[in-house]
């Protein structure tokens, strides 16, 4: 019977080796197709995902997710990314950039035979939590037949839970802040085997203030990686990031530096000219006239979103209302995203957090209540509609002061929205209802005041002052349109921006509020001072001031001693007579030229010549500080342009060497920090194990009973089992109620003491 079993094992081993050889042969064929690909010749012949040199597992996931045909950006980027080259892709919003980098990521891991033991192999950075969630969902759909482990890390989740599992991930999708935190703090998270880095919506990441986090992420990664950078627009900051992160990148989708991605062709764009105090009336009328539509409304601040949502929900326009902004909890943000995605007719009030990358299906209208900060933001906002060739419409509300400047900036980017007239009959005013709500509900009134202040601040901080003119805004009319009795007072504080405060490390903020001993110290300015505090702090109500007492010399000796110790400057004598000091005779210049020369600093310096200060070089040789070279000596050294190029090249080499040294030093510091953290954790684990060994306790997890092993750890003095709780029929109270059933057994008493003890026992029972 043993021989057939061996034959079966041999057959299984042969089948496994054959399957492995077949898989390697398929990968070699795919690699040959990738190497032979020529964009100029083969791009026209590719129209379906099945035409690409990708594995059957990835193709099966694409087909089941209904991804069949390729878009323009996918045709151009996927074959080049499969070759392993760095890529900088730019295309219109809604053109399929997500699949353009997810397919190369999955295929790169398959060709490199990455397993769960190889650690992190691909890193995808998204600017917002919603976009990261959407990217992760698409990744799980197309990669469901592969054996990679993928994880999603975003803000608003348990950091410790993520740290325990992030080291076992092959593909990691997340926001810049959380990924940077894990790279700095997570133990066991190695990036030496990383193959691909993807920066999705790179310009948005930089606009949101994540430059430091992205630089930190890039610094942790190996230089031999492949980097894919995708964005809907290209700015100077994105070009700088590409220059630092990419190596000889292929630029796809951008024909020139001045080219900016236009809006989709299937999008109908309109704008209206409207006063500030009529915006909410027009928005209400628009929603009432489009109840059978899916509408996305953009505001400039989260406070405006809250106010519009609460008031419109109370007035009940007849359509489902939703809100989405940055300071929501992560769970509620995901619920809102899912509800709006699945709804057929709904209206979502949102900030620019929704303007990038999110794919909401079948949006009919995009309404911009507040003017976007630039043409790039306009492109991303209206790009939520008319995605993947669908029809869509957009409406932009412009103030009379914003119309001319904003239209010029849109025309410069080849965007020409059509003007739309508003019929006065179709416009309905909701100002009386808003005033009634603010009068009845203090919460809505507070929201209105905060919305007013946040809108003015958003206009004030805009850089383009030709478009945004805060001095021309009618504050009283706008406050009345919100239902407020008057315009609130606005205090605009200077200092660091809100983005920097939001992205600042909470540990550093907490550390800044501690003293030298590490104890937290409350800020004196933030304390609330009551009228009693001010009453006890009053001074000089019935006595003369300290300064007057000092001048009159009516201080005591103790006060004078304290003054000498504590005061830095004090009055030492009073009403003293000044002694006349003989002043030197100043000769007045006779001529006007000498007088002018004496009064003019420039003329007086010209006669003194150059300064005679000496400067010593590294070898200790003294040189004059203004030691200049003659023109003849300069010409002998060669052409000025050639000297300039040589100087720039020398300094560039010096800076590159210094940069490499700084990177090596920073990397050593990070490794040393991580090593110390690992030592501390190892020491803590050893202490726990030692404490467990001292107690000499053995835990058996499964398996058969081992009596010899158990007897080795047994002791003579076993712990007595804990007394069980007496049952109801064993209770003393029950025994007292039934004294007949209780029998007391005793020996025959012989002495007087025995009789006394017997009497006591009988009395107890």
From Swiss-Prot:
One Gene Ontology cellular component annotation held by this UniProt entry: small-subunit processome
Region listing for Disordered, in residue ranges: 1-24, 493-526, 552-576, 641-735
Biased composition (Basic residues): 1-14
Domain Helicase ATP-binding: residue ranges: 78-252
Family: Belongs to the DEAD box helicase family. DDX10/DBP4 subfamily.
Oligomer status and interactors: Interacts with the U3 and U14 snoRNAs. Associates with pre-ribosomal complexes.
Protein's UniProt name: ATP-dependent RNA helicase DBP4
Gene name tied to this protein: DBP4
């Amino acid at each position: 019977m043993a021989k057939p079993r061996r034959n079966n094992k041999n057959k299984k081993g042969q089948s496994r080796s054959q399957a492995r050889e077949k898989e390697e042969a398929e990968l070699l064929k795919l690699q040959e197709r990738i190497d032979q690909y020529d964009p100029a010749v083969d791009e026209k012949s590719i129209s379906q995902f099945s035409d690409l040199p990708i594995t059957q597992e990835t193709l099966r996931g694409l087909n089941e997710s209904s991804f069949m045909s390729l878009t323009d950006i996918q045709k151009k980027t996927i074959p080049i990314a499969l070759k392993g080259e760095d890529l900088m892709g730019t295309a219109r919003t809604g053109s399929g950039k997500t699949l353009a980098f997810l397919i190369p990521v999955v295929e790169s891991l398959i060709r490199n035979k990455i397993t769960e033991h190889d650690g992190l192999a691909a890193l995808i950075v998204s600017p917002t939590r919603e976009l990261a969630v959407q990217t992760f969902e698409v990744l799980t759909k197309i990669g469901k037949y592969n054996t990679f482990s993928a994880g999603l890390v975003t803000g608003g989740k348990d950091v410790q839970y993520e740290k325990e599992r992030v080291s076992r991930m092959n593909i990691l999708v997340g926001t810049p802040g959380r990924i940077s935190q894990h790279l700095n703090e997570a133990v066991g998270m190695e990036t030496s085997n990383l193959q691909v880095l993807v920066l999705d919506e790179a310009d948005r990441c930089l606009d949101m203030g994540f430059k430091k986090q992205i630089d930190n992420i890039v610094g942790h990664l190996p230089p031999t990686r492949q980097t894919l950078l995708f964005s809907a627009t290209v700015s100077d900051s994105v070009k700088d990031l590409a220059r630092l992160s990419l190596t000889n990148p292929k630029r796809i989708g951008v024909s020139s530096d001045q080219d900016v991605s236009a809006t989709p062709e299937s999008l109908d764009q309109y704008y209206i000219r409207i006063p500030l105090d009529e915006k909410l009336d027009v928005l209400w009328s628009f929603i009432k006239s489009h109840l059978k539509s899916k509408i996305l409304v953009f505001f400039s601040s989260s406070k405006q979103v809250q106010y519009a949502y609460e008031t419109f929900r109370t007035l009940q326009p007849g359509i489902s209302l939703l809100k989405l902004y940055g300071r929501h909890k992560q769970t509620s943000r995901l619920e809102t995203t899912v509800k709006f995605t699945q709804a057929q007719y709904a209206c979502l009030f949102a900030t620019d957090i929704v303007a990038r990358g999110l794919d909401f299906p079948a949006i009919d209208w995009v309404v911009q209540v507040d003017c976007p900060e630039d043409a790039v933001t306009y492109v991303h906002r209206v790009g939520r509609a008319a995605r993947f060739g669908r029809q869509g419409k957009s409406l932009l509300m412009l103030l009379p002061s914003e119309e001319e400047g904003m239209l010029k900036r849109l025309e410069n980017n080849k965007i020409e929205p059509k003007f739309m007239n508003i019929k006065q009959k179709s416009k309905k005013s909701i100002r009386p209802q808003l005033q009634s709500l603010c009068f009845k509900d203090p919460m809505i009134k507070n929201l209105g005041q905060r919305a007013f202040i946040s809108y003015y601040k958003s206009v004030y901080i805009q850089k383009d002052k030709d478009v945004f003119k805060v001095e021309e805004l009618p504050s009283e009319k706008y406050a009345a349109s919100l239902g407020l009795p008057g315009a609130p007072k606005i205090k605009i504080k200077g200092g660091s921006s809100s983005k920097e405060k939001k992205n600042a490390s909470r540990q550093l903020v907490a550390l800044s509020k501690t003293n030298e001993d590490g104890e937290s110290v409350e800020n004196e300015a933030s304390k609330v001072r009551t009228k009693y505090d001010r009453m006890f702090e009053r001074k000089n109500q019935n006595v003369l001031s300290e300064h007057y007492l000092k001048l009159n010399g009516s201080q005591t000796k103790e006060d004078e001693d304290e003054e000498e110790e504590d005061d830095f400057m004090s009055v030492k004598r009073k009403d003293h007579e000044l002694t006349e000091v003989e002043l030197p005779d100043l000769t007045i210049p006779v001529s006007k030229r000498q007088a002018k020369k004496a009064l003019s600093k420039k003329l007086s310096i010209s006669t003194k010549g150059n300064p005679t200060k000496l400067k010593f070089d590294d070898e200790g040789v003294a040189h004059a500080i203004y030691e200049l070279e003659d023109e003849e000596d300069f010409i002998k050294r060669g052409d000025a342009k050639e000297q300039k190029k040589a100087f720039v090249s020398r300094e560039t080499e010096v800076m590159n060497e210094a940069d490499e040294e700084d990177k090596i030093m920073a990397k050593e510091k990070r490794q040393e920090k991580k090593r110390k953290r690992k030592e501390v954790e190892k020491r803590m684990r050893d202490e726990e194990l030692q404490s467990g060994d001292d107690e000499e306790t053995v835990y058996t997890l499964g398996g058969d009973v081992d009596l010899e092993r158990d007897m080795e750890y047994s002791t003579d003095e076993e712990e007595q089992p804990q007394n069980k709780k007496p049952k109801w029929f064993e209770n003393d109270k029950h025994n007292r109620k039934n004294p007949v059933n209780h029998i007391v057994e005793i020996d025959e008493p012989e002495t007087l003491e025995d009789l006394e003890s017997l009497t006591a026992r009988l009395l107890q029972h």
